[in-house]
């Protein structure tokens, strides 16, 4: 591997962190509010509009089809992304994804904590048969030897299962049910100091790394500049299974160390879990739950309304018939009068013609 290539990877790694990671409050430096826990094992199918109590679109516009949620770049300055409103404190994230094809375009799955621990899957759009794995701890990007490269056939046209298995002892990346990489706590950067170990939310999205203004190493890593004439570039998220290994309603940092031992799991019912397990009821479900007496009342009320409408219609029909008969009688009288006038006119005309043996005006 050439030095130039390693430097390119290093620069790209830094850019990836900059482009994909941010935090609204860093508990390494300040006291932050607790994170909402997921606290359960659940599956999300992305073929309809997202529930904004669970998922937050952080940039751009997403579209939803029978196949899944689409993250699409159609022009410059676009990077559609979303993230979960919940956090998991160790667990499993099983994502079924098709990457976006196109030089310069990066598709990504990111688990990230408030103190910038990070676990990544990334696809560079020019290579549709490879996915990259990576990790960071506390935002540290001093080294560039953390990445892994894994073969995946037809990653842009076929859905594959990319699973992250994460505990305090080890981190595993799985592809279609086969283990691709293992990182232990002890083998991570800093002998565990920079091992991802604090509660993370989940982020999905695509972004253009191959754009003018980015470092040359970043552009080369991404496969060159983006050719927007070949747009759209689309990543598709079909479904996600998330298993939070802790139960509770919130995760709280008790100090500024960023260690997993410092995280307090606050007992209680997760509001996110409640939203998932008890979604708003449909009209049919609400109707099914009504007692028999209430249903009878609804039927009677509906019957009364129907009867009133029918009576109104009958009254209107009768009134219209009476009105029609009156109008018909008036028309008959008018017709008879006009016929009498015409008969008189014809008689006068004939009398004039017979008397004068020719045509004469009739007054």
Swiss-Prot record:
Pfam families: Glyco_hydro_16. Chitin binds at residues 122, 203, 207, 218. One of its GO terms (molecular function) is hydrolase activity, hydrolyzing O-glycosyl compounds. It is found in: Cell membrane; Secreted, Cell wall. Residues 26-237 form the GH16 domain. Keywords: Cell membrane, Cell wall, Cell wall biogenesis/degradation, Disulfide bond, Glycoprotein, Glycosidase, Glycosyltransferase, GPI-anchor, Hydrolase, Lipoprotein, Membrane, Secreted, Signal, Transferase, Transmembrane, Transmembrane helix. Residues 1-19 form the signal peptide. One of its GO terms (cellular component) is plasma membrane. It is a lipid-anchor; GPI-anchor. Glycans are attached at residues 41, 47, 56, 127, 141, 161, 252, 269. Disruption phenotype: Does not affect growth rate, germination or sporulation and displays only minor sensitivity to high concentrations of Congo Red, even when all crh family members are deleted. It catalyses: Random endo-hydrolysis of N-acetyl-beta-D-glucosaminide (1->4)-beta-linkages in chitin and chitodextrins. Its EC number is 3.2.1.14, 2.4.-.-. The GPI-like anchor contains a phosphoceramide lipid group. The anchor position has not been determined. The chain crosses the membrane at residues 298-318. PANTHER family: GLYCOSIDASE-RELATED (PTHR10963:SF27), GLYCOSYL HYDROLASE-RELATED (PTHR10963). Belongs to the glycosyl hydrolase 16 family. CRH1 subfamily. Dual chitinase/transglycosylase that plays a role in cell wall architecture. Chitinase and transglycosylase activities are coupled. Required for the polysaccharide cross-linking at the septa and the cell wall. More specifically, transfers chitin to 1,6-beta-glucan in the cell wall. This is Crh-like protein 3. It comes from Aspergillus fumigatus (strain ATCC MYA-4609 / CBS 101355 / FGSC A1100 / Af293) (Neosartorya fumigata). The lineage of its organism: Eukaryota, Fungi, Dikarya, Ascomycota, Pezizomycotina. The gene is crh3.
């Amino acid at each position: 591997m050439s030095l130039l290539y390693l430097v390119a990877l290093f620069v790209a790694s830094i850019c990836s962190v900059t482009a994909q990671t941010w935090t609204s409050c860093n508990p390494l430096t300040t006291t932050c509010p607790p994170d909402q826990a997921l606290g359960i094992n659940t599956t999300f199918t992305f073929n309809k509009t997202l529930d904004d109590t669970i998922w937050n679109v952080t940039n751009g516009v997403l579209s939803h089809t029978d196949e899944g949620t689409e993250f699409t770049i159609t022009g410059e300055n676009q990077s559609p992304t979303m993230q979960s409103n919940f956090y998991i404190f160790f667990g499993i994230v099983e994502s079924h994804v098709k990457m976006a094809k196109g030089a310069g375009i990066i598709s990504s799955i990111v688990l990230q904590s408030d103190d910038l621990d990070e676990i990544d899957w990334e696809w560079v759009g020019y290579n549709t048969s490879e996915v990259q794995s990576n990790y960071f701890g506390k935002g540290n990007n001093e080294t560039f030897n953390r990445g892994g490269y894994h073969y995946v056939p037809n990653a842009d046209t076929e859905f594959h299962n990319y699973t992250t298995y994460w505990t305090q002892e080890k981190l595993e990346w799985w592809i279609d049910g086969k283990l691709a990489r293992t990182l232990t706590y002890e083998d991570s950067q800093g002998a565990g100091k920079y091992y991802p170990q604090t509660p993370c939310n989940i982020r999905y999205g695509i972004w253009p790394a191959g754009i003018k203004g980015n470092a040359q190493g970043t552009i080369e890593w991404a496969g060159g500049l983006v050719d927007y004439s070949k747009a759209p570039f689309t990543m598709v998220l079909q479904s996600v299974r998330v298993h939070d290994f802790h139960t509770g309603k919130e995760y709280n940092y008790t100090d500024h160390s960023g260690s997993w031992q410092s995280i307090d799991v606050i007992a209680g019912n997760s509001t996110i879990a409640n939203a998932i397990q008890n979604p708003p009821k449909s009209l049919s479900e609400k109707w099914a739950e009504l007692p028999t007496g209430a249903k009878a009342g609804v039927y009677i009320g509906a019957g009364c309304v129907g009867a009133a409408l029918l009576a109104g219609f009958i009254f209107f029909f009768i009134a219209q018939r009476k009105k029609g008969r009156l109008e018909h009688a008036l028309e008959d009288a008018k017709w008879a009068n006009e016929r009498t006038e015409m008969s008189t006119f014809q008689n006068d005309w004939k009398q004039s013609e017979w008397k004068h043996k020719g045509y004469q005006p009739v007054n």
